Amino acid sequence: MQQEEDDYFQSEEFLDILGRYEQAASSGHTPYMDSDELVDVADYYMSQGKHQEATEATRLALELHPDAQDPVTMMADILFETQQWKDSILWLNRVLDNDPFDVQAWLNLADAQIQCDQFAEALDSAEYTLAIQPDNLHALLQKAYATSRQDRYQEASEIFAQYIERCPDDELALYHAAFNLCFLERFHEANDMLTRAEELSQGLSPEHLNICLQRSYTEARIGHMQEALDALERSKEFQDPYTKVDYNLLSGHVYLLFQHRDKALECFTKALANAEDHLHTMRTIAQVFMDCQDFLTASDILREIEEMAQRPEYEDTRAEAIKAICPAQAYCYYQTGHKDEFLHYLQMAIALNPKDTQIFFRDIFPKEARVEDYLYYANGLE
C-alpha cells in the first residue's frame, strides 16, 4: 500500500496535479480542482511532514466541494496525526456520521478520546469497533485501558488477559495490565508482567521508564527492597528533569514501605525542590503516606496544602487544589478516628468532588448508597 502511494506521488499524473496546485497557490490564485485531486495533494504533503500545507489543501477541498466526504476524512486524519485531539474528535464524528462502519475512524476516535480523558466515550467507540470486527486487537486493548481508567479494575484485568493471551509479547499491554493489577493489590502477578515487559523492551519501548518505575513499586510491595532499588537505578538513564521528580517520589515510596523514614523524607525533599507544581507534588507525597498506612502524616500534609492554597500565588489553582484534597482528607480523618473533622471534610468532598469521594468510600458505605447520601451513613458510624 505504501509503495503504491509512493509510486503514485512520482507519477506524471500526480506531478501534473501538484504542479497545477502549487503554481496557482504561488501566484495567489485559488485553483479550481476536483475534490479527489486536492485530497491527493494534501495526502502528499502529509507524507512529507508538511502539515500546514496539507491543511490548506484540505480546507480548499472542503470549500469547493462541501458535499464531498474525502476531504472530511482527510481533515480528521490530519488533526489526528498532529495530535489535535479535541478537534479530531469533532471531525472523526463527522466521518462516522457518513460511514458508521469505518473501523479506522472508530479506532482513531477511541484513541483521541483516551487522550482527552473521555474514557466512557472511548469505551463506547472501542465497543463499536468490536461489534464490526470482533477480532480487532487494537480495539480490545482500548477497551481494557478505558475500562481500567473508569476504576473497573477487575473487569479490566479480564480484558487485558484476553489481549495478552493473543499478544504475549506486547510490552505496552503488559505494563498497563500490571498497572491495573496494582489497584487490585495483585502485586506478584503485576511484578511478573513488568519483569517480562522490561525484558521485551530492552530500553527501546516508549514506556521503558515507566516500566522500570512501576516495577520498582511492585518489587517493594512484595518485599524485595534491593530489587526495587535496582529497578530505580535502571530507570536513571531514561530520565529528564520532569521524570526526576517521579523518580524521587517513587524512591521515597520504596524507602517508606521498608520503614526507612529518614531516607524517604530526603527523597521527598528532592522531589519538591525540582517540582514545578508544588501542590500537586505534595498531594502525591500525601498519597504515598496513605498507601503506607500513615494517615496522620498524610493528613498533616493535606492540611499544609490547604493552607498554602490560600496564598495569593495559588489563586488560579486554589479551587482545584481544595477539590482534590477533600476526599483524601476525609478518608484520613476517618482512619484516625477524628469524627468531627471527618464529617466536615466528607461534606465538602461530597459537594466538590463526588467522583473521588466514591472511590475512597465505596468499600466503607453500602454499595447501593448514593454519594450524596454518604453523610447520612457517616453519622451512623461508631
Regions found by a protein language model. Name each.
Residues A61, R94-V95, Y128-T129, Q162-Y163, ...:
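Canonical positions in the second alpha-helix
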Residues P66, P100, P134, P168, ...:
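Short coil turns that delineate tetratricopeptide repeat
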Residues M74, N108, Q142, H176, ...:
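Canonical tetratricopeptide repeat
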